[in-house]
Regions:
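Short stretches within intrinsically disordered, low-complexity N-terminal or propeptide regions
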Residues: 5, 68, 129, 201-202
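A short beta-strand segment in extracellular, disulfide-stabilized domains
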Residues: 84-86, 209-212
């Protein structure tokens, strides 16, 4: 069977329609690809995603149904010290044992102060177009990731962190059944609390947002 080659005005029209259809498919695929492979540094409004949140899920509305939690956060940091963080993002309905979303993603930033690292099996990446923001590289079925943060070598004052987390239904497209929330916290500068005054300087804590 030989291939048929369209020529003339009709052929040009067919080619234009085919190209337009392929272009439209690509555009429709971008949101799903962008979210499943991790959010970009900037959201759809042109603001840092970690600090301003997601503008594509749940019509851009923040929701307490999305629980965002970070464990291993120190009260204050010691210069060059390494801290182990665990990040969890979940649907509060799922945490309560009810039907809810079971997949999740996130992005975290320290304002490029200190350094994040992680093991290869964590499916993390530097967020697209950012210097040091970290996000998931694949949507997680557990919603739990482990990474380390190394404090800067010099006293940089109090360091502020922001985390945006998505709890999603896994259908590959942003929608009303996907929920996101934002968490911010601060790690105090060295010497904020003297060791002799409060043993809490040696402890880490869990910080979270959302209803559960």
């Amino acid at each position: 069977m030989s291939a048929r080659l369209w020529r003339g005005p009709m052929g040009s029209q067919v080619l234009r329609r085919t190209a337009l259809a392929l272009f439209t498919i690509c555009l429709l695929s971008l949101p799903a690809l962008g979210n499943s492979g991790g959010p970009p540094y900037l959201n759809g409004d042109g603001n840092p995603t970690a600090e301003y949140g997601c503008s594509c899920h749940n019509n851009g509305q923040i929701s307490d149904r999305a629980v965002v939690m970070v464990t291993g956060v120190p009260i204050q940091y010691a210069t060059s010290e390494i801290y182990d963080f665990t990040i969890q993002v979940a649907d509060s309905h799922t945490l309560a044992g009810d039907d809810g979303n079971t997949q999740a993603g996130f992005v975290i930033t320290s304002g490029d102060v200190g350094t994040f690292t992680w093991q290869d099996d964590q499916e993390l990446r530097i967020a697209e177009d950012s210097q040091g923001d970290v996000s998931h590289s694949e949507t997680s079925d557990t919603g739990i990731w482990s990474l380390t943060w190394q404090a800067p070598a010099a006293d940089e004052g109090d360091i502020h962190f922001w985390v945006a987390g998505n709890s999603v239904n896994g259908d590959g497209a942003p929608g009303d059944d996907d929920y996101w929330n934002m968490l911010s916290f601060t790690i105090n500068a060295p010497g904020t609390i003297e060791n002799d005054d409060n043993a809490a300087t040696l402890e880490t804590r869990t910080v979270s947002v959302g209803s559960y």
